[in-house]
Amino acid sequence: SLKEEVILDIVKGRSPQIENTGDTIVFSVTGKPIVPRSENQLKLVQEYEKNDMLFAIGPAGSGKTYTAIALAVRSLKNKEIKKIILSRPAVEAGEKLGFLPGDMKDKIDPYLQPLYDALQDMIPAAKLKEYMELNVIQIAPLAFMRGRTLNDAVVILDEAQNTTTQQIKMFLTRMGMNTKMIVTGDMTQIDLPSSQTSGLIQALKILKGVKGISFIELNKKDIVRHKLVTRIVEAYEKFEEKQKTLHSCHSERSEKSENIKRIY
């Protein structure tokens, strides 16, 4: 049951005050504790306490982005930082966004809506609007990060599998004093042209073993959406594995055919 102070905060449109309640990260706007719902989500929370840069890699619905945003909101409410900065690469718009109608907010909203959704679960609407007007919470496409130094912040890069190698290096080197960075991505949902290397894949290879950087891998066991999501992920994994096998067999047959032609 909710404490009287928590109920009062909700009625007055304030975020409930955070207490150290075991695994609770923050309270939702309805007063419900937001907690890690799987072993790997808990690991993400624990690694956040020990490292300034985290990479959380896993399938859709595994809670990587939601948990990351909850950690950022907790740090802001506990006055450990001064701002939260959320970003994702707008692949569909080539990171330029110039062809879309409307002002900047109208242009970026479609790509960043999932981040708004998570924030709205954790911060009352009026307070969230105030935070955004004061730039305490900033949500912007990755291209808008160039040239900035990000101090006193938790910075989250979502959908990082769709960054180029240059973009992710640019992002990671924006890190300033008293700042934590969380990079999330799903290796099965790369939307880049096949000729381009995912910046996330390259970064994972280059940064492995660097002190102060933690890597958390989530999987289908961590999926906390509708149970069908897990089945859908499994079905696609089987399909993709089958496609790889068929492609491999086709390549072998083509190679044998070429060798026979050379003989004759």
Residue ranges and their predicted role:
Residues 250-254:
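Short acidic, low-complexity intrinsically disordered linear motifs used
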Residues 21-33:
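Conserved adenine-nucleotide phosphate-binding loops and their immediately adjacent elements
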Residues 1-21:
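Interdomain "pre-motor" coupling segment immediately N-terminal to P-loop NTPase/helicase cores
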Residues 255-262:
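A cross-taxon signal for low-complexity, glycine/charged-rich
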Residues 31-39, 47-157, 161-249, 264:
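Conserved helicase motor core of SF1/SF2 NTP-dependent helicases
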